[in-house]
């Protein structure tokens, strides 16, 4: 009797390999999302306790950008796995931003430079929404995220005790885990994820500055 495709051991093995290949990126997305939630919980907890003082410009923009992109993604029926991670990437900063208003000890005074960086980030977000080229849109999204990061980087560098380290450790690991899940390696697919990995890596250096023996402040 001739075996069909489902009875062919070689075909079964190929199907199994294809299934494993297809689910591996999903596993990375799940782990990455859980890391973000864990780090976000620790930061939110410390914010409510007054131990951590979020820079509201950074955290507002970190919440805004993913949620804006999520709205656009839903309008074109984007992949649900990627959308879940984007949703968490917007909700976690949003919750932290709101949490900073519940304890006066969590307040961090904003400077004109913070507002300037926020303005640049918002401008990049605006042009990102208007961009017709996917490549330009991704680069603008990366620029918006970088401009939003600068105020918190300076604060963390000068006053690392006002930050919760775990969120940056987890965010860095989360960004690294997503790299192998990139389906096609080109600038459009990888630029934003690489910028996230580099940004969180820089933040790790900032929050561990004193532990690394770096005394110079900005």
Name each region found by the language model.
Residues 16-218:
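Alpha-helical membrane-protein topology signature
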Residues 1-20:
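N-terminal amphipathic/basic-hydrophobic helices that include classical n-h-c signal peptides
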